[in-house]
Amino acid sequence: GRSLVFPEETANSFVELFPAKELSL
């Protein structure tokens, strides 16, 4: 997942915890 608005796979669930803008993903 790249953001809280776009949840994807559980493998990327750790990314959902933070805004995509801060991770620059």
Swiss-Prot record:
Cofactor(s) the protein requires to work: Ca(2+)
Post-translational modifications reported in the UniProt record: Glycosylated.
Keywords linked to the UniProt accession: Acute phase, Calcium, Metal-binding, Secreted
Protein known as: C-reactive protein P2 subunit 4
Residue ranges of every copy of the Pentraxin (PTX) domain listed in the record: 1-25
Localization: Secreted
The protein's assembly and partners: Heteropentamer. Discoid arrangement of 5 non-covalently bound subunits 1, 2, 3 and 4.
GO molecular function, one term: metal ion binding
Domain of life of the source: Eukaryota
Details of cofactor binding: Binds 2 calcium ions per subunit.
Single GO cellular component term: extracellular region
Family: Belongs to the pentraxin family.
Organism: Gadus morhua (Atlantic cod)
Function: Displays several functions associated with host defense: it promotes agglutination, bacterial capsular swelling, phagocytosis, and complement fixation through its calcium-dependent binding to phosphorylcholine.
GO terms classed as biological process: acute-phase response
Primary localization: secreted
